[in-house]
A protein has these predicted regions:
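Glycine-enriched, solvent-exposed interface loops adjoining structured elements
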Residues: 1-182
Length: 182
């Protein structure tokens, strides 16, 4: 059950700094306050983390769309990135609305979960990513940044692998070599 300060403190420890308990604590707190939210959101959308993927039947709005689509739907407030819709059809997003010609739409999307629900492997990978971002503004040490870049890439790869274990592998549908054997 991590908090944003736990994650930031892990990142600071990776670059040899002291942990913080608020974003008003010196240079480290200021840097963390400015980089945490965007880094977290970018990292959440870097892959389809299973704990951050949701499915939702969208609420149709009564307003008539002003474009070529027949229907408008309200997007969820925690949306970070759409993945796709069901039925699978052409759609467009403008501001906080999705437009489609279907009268009902289910959206698969990446959302922003609370930090307390992050799995340990994601916390570790996000902390490494933050450490890379913090290295120059806090330590002004290019060697440290390069080391954290390598560490962040390694922990990301491991975290993505662990997260992928939570779903059934996709079956290979097209098998040209088997079809040739007849």
């Amino acid at each position: 059950m991590a908090t944003k300060f736990d994650i930031v403190s892990q990142a600071l420890l990776l670059i040899g700094e002291s942990p913080i308990s608020s974003f008003s604590e010196g240079v480290s707190g200021t840097v963390a306050a400015n980089l945490y939210d965007t880094t977290r959101d970018s990292f959440l959308t870097a892959t389809r983390w299973r704990f951050a993927v949701g499915k939702l039947k969208l609420s149709r709005l009564t307003d008539t769309p002003l474009n070529e689509y027949s229907y408008a739907f309200q997007l969820p407030s925690d949306l970070l990135m759409p993945i796709g819709t069901y039925p699978s059809a052409r759609y467009e997003i403008y501001e906080d609305k999705l437009y489609s010609n279907h009268n009902e739409v289910e959206l698969d999307y990446i959302f922003r979960p609370d930090e307390s629900t992050f799995p340990a492997y994601f916390v570790e990978a996000l902390a490494a990513q933050l450490a890379e971002k913090f290295a120059i503004p806090i330590t002004n040490n290019q060697t440290m940044r390069q080391a954290m870049e390598a560490h962040a890439a390694d922990t990301y790869r491991k975290a993505a692998f662990r997260d992928a274990q939570g779903r059934t592998p996709k079956a290979i549908k097209h098998r040209p070599y088997i079809a040739v054997r007849g």
